Amino acid sequence: MENTKTNASSSGMSSSSSFSVSYAEEMLLADEVSKINSMSILGPNQLKLCTQLVLSNGAAPVVLSLVSKEKKSILSRILPKIGQRLYVHHSAIYLLYMPNILKSSSGSITLKLFDEATEELVDVDTDHDATQACIFAGRYPRSILAKDAAKGHDLKLVVHAVASTKANSAVGVLYPIWEDELSRKQILERGADFLKFPIAETEPVRDLLNAGKLTDFVLDRTRLGVGSKNDPSPVLLEPRAKITGKAKTVFIPEGPSVPNTTISGMAPTVRIDAGSPKGLGVPKGFTYESFIKDEILPDH
């Protein structure tokens, strides 16, 4: 069964165009779409992580097509067979953002969806804190014509980053994850804002407080001391000459009968003790030889 439709202007047949539709073609379209959806690489509800986008400070906006190369290749093969009555749906779009800059810096990220065929924009987030990791989740509420997607006029993700850090330095990394499903039916959904799920910072991945490793590190690079653990308390220091021993002084009373005696060539020194209670005399029987031997040279 085949029908023909003709469009004419008000002036008659001055301008016309016609095309034919076929029930067989519609069935072929349904069969082809079913085959596409049954393929593991292009199955429905299959999310795709195709790339990562490094966002540079102040650089030109990054633009990414949200129709994968695999889908475009399939479209280029099947569109001549089934005509142009096929659509691409983006029923799930996730954008994982991981910052490269510290919390002490500042910056913002702008994310938008752009339908190149209709030149329409949908805001994902126009002022996201560039220091905060998060996941954006949402969808595009309209279908993209397969013929437009095959030509590259598809849904685009546009991202721009500005921060207080060095120009053209990496502000963060964006991981787009999406679903691009082929269907012969259009979608008509209410537009909804993208959801944003912040990601908390994690604990350190390594424990620094390992006493054994720190001790080994110090021992390898430090000269160890062997002195006392505690220094002495400050005290008054009095410099004095050190006396090794006390000299012995011999008091020898001198009388008129005391001879000058020399023993072994050594003459003893005689000190006159005028204050002796016994006067200037000497005891009876006193001799220098016995005094020297007994008092001065007891070891000889």
From Swiss-Prot:
Transmembrane segments: none annotated. It comes from Alfalfa mosaic virus (strain YSMV). One of its GO terms (biological process) is transport of virus in host, cell to cell. Belongs to the alfamovirus movement protein family. Transports viral genome to neighboring plant cells directly through plasmosdesmata, without any budding. The movement protein allows efficient cell to cell propagation, by bypassing the host cell wall barrier. Acts by forming a tubular structure at the host plasmodesmata, enlarging it enough to allow free passage of virion capsids. It holds the Pfam family Bromo_MP. Its main location: host cell. It is found in: Host cell junction, Host plasmodesma. One of its GO terms (cellular component) is host cell plasmodesma. This is Movement protein. InterPro entries: Bromo_MP (IPR002538).
